[in-house]
Each structure stands twice: as C-alpha cells, then as structure tokens.
Amino acid sequence: MVLWGPVLGVLLVAIVGYLCLQGLLRQRRPEEPPLDKGSVPWLGHAMTFRKNMLEFLKHMWARHGDIFTVQLGGQYFTFVMDPLSFGPILKDAKRKLDFVEYAEKLVLKVFGYRSMQGDHRMIHSASTKHLMGDGLEELNKAMLDNLSLVMLGPKGPSPDASCWREDGLFHFCYDILFKAGYLSLFGRTEDKEQDLLQAEELFMQFRKFDRMFPRFVYSLLGPREWLEVGRLQCLFHKMLSVEHSLERHGISSWITDMLQVLREQGVAPAMQDKFNFMMLWASQGNTGPTTFWALLFLLKHPEAMRAVREEATRVLGEARLEDKQSFDVEVSALNHMPVLDSVMEETLRLGAAPTLLRVVNSDQILKMASGQEYRLRHGDILALFPYLSVHMDPDIHPEPTTFKYDRFLTPSGSRKVNFYKAGKKIHHYTMPWGSGISICPGRFFALTEMKLFVLLMVTHFDLELVDPDTPVPPVDPQRWGFGTMQPSYEVRFRYRLRPTE
C-alpha cells in the first residue's frame, strides 16, 4: 500500500526547497545592476511591493540609484528609474526585449483568452484602421449618440432633469463612460430601454471584477473570491458572446474586423467570447476613473473650470440639445481645444500609473544616459514605472503633485511639448499610455471619449461638490501599476441639466 500523504509531503518540501535554493544561489555578477533579493526566500520583496508599489520603489531608488534588480515572487525585475535612459528600452531596435510573452500569460490568466500568433499585430492593425484618423469618426459619432442615450435617457431629458441630483462622482463617471463605451463598441438592439438595463447589469458585474483585479493578478484572493472570479469570467463570456452579437446592430468595425480575423484563423467561438471580454476591459477599464479625476480637479480649481467653459463657448457657441433629445456637438471641434487638452494631459500625468514590462530575451548590455553600462540577465523582466520616474520628477514638472490646468500650454495658448531634465530635452515627458511596442492602440478613441464626456458635463450641466472643502482623496495603493488610479473613497457631488432653448 502506497502512503501518498508522506510521498506528496516529501515532494512538496523538495519543490519548495528547490525554489528557495534558486533564490539563495542568485548572486550579483560583475557589471549587473544592484541586486536586492529581500529577506524571504523566493518571495523576496513581493508582499511589500504588492502592499504599496510606489513607496517600495521610492525606497529602492533611494537605496540603490537609477537602476536595480529586485526579487518578487521568484521572478527578478530590473527597474530603470532614469527617464533619459528609456530610449534604448522603448526603441529596442534589435528586439531583445519581449513585451508579448508577458502580456500573453496575463491575458490567459485574467480573461481566459489564449493568444494566437500574430494577435498583437492584428490588434494594432485594426486599431490603426478604426481608432485613428478618418477611421475614428464613425466610432466618435456612435460614442456621442450613446452618451446622449445614457446621460439623457431613451426619450430625452425627463421633466425633472433640471432639478439637483446627488451621486458619487467616481461611480457617476465610471458608470456613464462604461455604458456608453460598451454600447458604442458592442452595438445595440431596437429596444433602447433594454439596452440600458443590460449595460447597467454588465457594469455592476464589471465593478465586482474590477475591485478584485489587483489581488487577482497577484494571486492573493481568498477561496470564495476565486470562485467569484470564475463565476464573473463565465458571465462576461456569455454576455459578450459572438452568438449574442448576432442580435445587435451597430457593432464597431474595430471589433468586427478583429473577430473576422479570428474566425479565419479557426479560433473557436468560445475563445472569441473571451477575446471580447479582453477588449471590453482594455477599452473601458481606465476611461471612467480618468474622467473622475478630471472633473474633480476642475471642481477643486474654479479657474480651470472657468477656462474650459470659456474655451468651449468660444469654439462651440452656446450649448444646445438637438431636438431636445441628444447633445448637439461637432466632435471634430475637440481638435481645437488646447485648454481641455492640457487639462486631460495633466489629469493623466497625476492619475495614470502603468508599469511597462519587457522580458529580457538574452543576456545583453544596457547603456544608461550617464554612460554607465549594465548587464541584463536572460529571463529577467525589465520594468519602467513612469509615474514615479517621470510624472513626479520636479525637474521635468515643477511642483509635480499640484494640479496645474495650463501645465501643457505655452504662453501663447498652444500645446507645450518641450520639457527638460538636467538641461536636456526629454522626449517621454508623460507616459500614461505606455510607449514603444506596448503603447495603447486605442488611446485616440479613449482620449476622445473622455474629452467628450468632460465637455458635455461642463457645458450642459451645473455641478458642484456637496462639501466644497472635501479634499482630493488619496489613491488606492493596491492599484499602483495597473493603469489609472482609483480613489480610496468616494466624493459626493450634485449636478443638474442646464435649461436650454
């Protein structure tokens, strides 16, 4: 009779021992960056990192300088903190750094989607065609129509729309942007009321998933939470299924073109459903939170609100509703609103905190701007965290923690693009969308929908904080590195539709 308990116990001890030994054996080689493995075998600094990534990196930067390698859960990450040294990493002309490998593992875990060879190229090709330039006009019009539907209702404003209403600003922004974005990308039926109800249900489930997302990525969920994540994944796959899409019209060409490529490659419908879930997350996970910060900053800075409204009146004229049922805005006018552009760029500088990751494909040399050369080890992950190293650098952005609506404007009122560090012009003065091969392919659509929503709110609505003295809330530290930050608590505000002739 085989005693499986002792056998499995010995096997487990052997595996854990091997993993710990691997961490203990790693030593810094000549010319490699400073190595900080932490005090816990294999785990290294993982728990401290996950608790508050920003504070951890500040500490490591102060201890080791502009480049260092840390152990996080058995994996070694080399962080480069000098933005003047980002160029070779982001250009990577010889393709010695791989973004796709890490991304494919992440989307499989989070969305259940198993990437096909060429997916990254396919997504960028479709995005270039439909989310930039002339191809973006169709989607922008759909977004305006759906913002009208979500914000004004299927029959236009109700008789009491001009009465004050109260809500949480974060929920309000996230809810509206998500529903309008979802309907613009995945289409509608003939029943607008039902479309809104379904979009509302999808958003409620999306928020449940969203709240667990950081701990899900780090595998820190409890047993019941793992079950809940599995349930939510199945629900999204069903609600976004290609089968259900047959009942809808107005699905964006961006989505239909990519699904057509997947079908031609023989991808099963069930996997296409998971692809749709991934696209929903990629397109809607950050826009709502970003507009929350934008409107909050405008509400806390009356001079900024005044400047945006004056620009809107100058460019668009008086705000009006078409047939009293939808917003009448020429979306192309957004291209002539540098003050609004600066507000959004400043909001992204303060609120967007993604981590850029590249897998080191082979041992190689990284030359820093200082001239110092460091050896990178095959299998390690090279990481950039621009929020700390760029957005919060007082040399690049004086008073970096302060919201300045005109930070990205020249004295003449045009867009400011010249920023400097140590007297040298810096190309990457903000990086909210990532950069290089991993730059967000949908950034132009995302920026348009955010600007459009903010514009509609400040021109068609009166809005004010319930408590004018309420401070800007601190961010939720668990979300560092995952795109746009979210507040640690809600902010209450009031709004009402302005009467129009």
Swiss-Prot record:
Keywords: Endoplasmic reticulum, Heme, Iron, Lipid biosynthesis, Lipid metabolism, Membrane, Metal-binding, Microsome, Monooxygenase, Oxidoreductase, Phosphoprotein, Steroid biosynthesis, Transmembrane, Transmembrane helix. One of its GO terms (cellular component) is endoplasmic reticulum membrane. GO terms for biological process: bile acid biosynthetic process; positive regulation of intestinal cholesterol absorption; steroid biosynthetic process. The keyword Iron applies. It holds the Pfam family p450. Its EC number is 1.14.14.139. GO terms for molecular function: heme binding; iron ion binding; sterol 12-alpha-hydroxylase activity. The chain crosses the membrane at residues 1-21. SUPFAM superfamilies: Cytochrome P450. Pathway: Lipid metabolism; bile acid biosynthesis. The keyword Phosphoprotein applies. It is found in: Endoplasmic reticulum membrane; Microsome membrane. Its main location: endoplasmic reticulum. It is a single-pass membrane protein. Heme binds at residue 440. It is an enzyme of class 1 (oxidoreductase). Its cofactor is heme. It catalyses: 7alpha-hydroxycholest-4-en-3-one + reduced [NADPH--hemoprotein reductase] + O2 = 7alpha,12alpha-dihydroxycholest-4-en-3-one + oxidized [NADPH--hemoprotein reductase] + H2O + H(+); 5beta-cholestane-3alpha,7alpha-diol + reduced [NADPH--hemoprotein reductase] + O2 = 5beta-cholestane-3alpha,7alpha,12alpha-triol + oxidized [NADPH--hemoprotein reductase] + H2O + H(+); chenodeoxycholate + reduced [NADPH--hemoprotein reductase] + O2 = cholate + oxidized [NADPH--hemoprotein reductase] + H2O + H(+). The modification Phosphoserine is found at residue 326. A cytochrome P450 monooxygenase involved in primary bile acid biosynthesis. Catalyzes the 12alpha-hydroxylation of 7alpha-hydroxy-4-cholesten-3-one, an intermediate metabolite in cholic acid biosynthesis. Controls biliary balance of cholic acid and chenodeoxycholic acid, ultimately regulating the intestinal absorption of dietary lipids. Mechanistically, uses molecular oxygen inserting one oxygen atom into a substrate, and reducing the second into a water molecule, with two electrons provided by NADPH via cytochrome P450 reductase (CPR; NADPH--hemoprotein reductase). Belongs to the cytochrome P450 family. This is 5-beta-cholestane-3-alpha,7-alpha-diol 12-alpha-hydroxylase. The gene is CYP8B1.
